From Swiss-Prot:
Family: Belongs to the TAF13 family.
Natural source organism: Schizosaccharomyces pombe (strain 972 / ATCC 24843)
Coiled coil: none
Locations listed in the record: Nucleus
GO cellular component, one term: transcription factor TFIID complex
Protein name as catalogued: Transcription initiation factor TFIID subunit 13
Keywords: Coiled coil, Nucleus, Transcription, Transcription regulation
Top-level division of the source organism's lineage: Eukaryota
Lineage: Eukaryota, Fungi, Dikarya, Ascomycota, Taphrinomycotina
The keyword Transcription regulation appears for this protein: yes
Domain Histone-fold as annotated: residue spans: 17-61
BP GO annotations: RNA polymerase II preinitiation complex assembly; transcription by RNA polymerase II; transcription initiation at RNA polymerase II promoter
TM stretches of this protein: none
Gene3D superfamilies: Histone, subunit A
Gene for this chain: taf13
Length: 111
């Protein structure tokens, strides 16, 4: 009997990368302080599957290029304006943080 999950891929070893974050999110959305481990595991599987699918789609879009770029992810999200908008917002915030750090470093070095 084959050991494949519902997506036709072999199951991956769980590393519980998002357990702490998922517990916090679940609590923030009204779950118990200590949610059921099965619930966390299911959500983690969904998150990991989504990330894998997005990375595969971005790599497909990148085609023969050696590197996947942010624009490949943005293109993959083009049909989901809410997610695309959030990506754009996070990119702007990332630039603002980097600029602020540069200013602070400059001020520290020159004053």
């Amino acid at each position: 009997m084959s050991m494949e999950n519902r997506r036709g891929r072999p199951p991956t070893r769980r590393q519980h990368l998002f357990t702490k974050d998922l517990k916090s999110l679940m609590y923030a959305f009204g779950d118990d302080v200590n949610p059921a481990p099965d619930s966390i595991n299911v959500l983690e599987e969904i998150v990991v599957d989504y990330i894998n699918e997005m990375c595969l789609e971005a790599a497909r879009i990148a085609g023969n290029r050696n590197k996947v770029k942010v624009d490949d992810f943005k293109f993959a999200l083009r049909d989901d304006p809410k997610k695309l908008g959030r990506v754009e917002e996070l990119l702007v915030l990332q630039k603002m943080i980097a600029d602020t750090r540069n200013v602070m470093k400059y001020n520290k070095d020159h004053f």
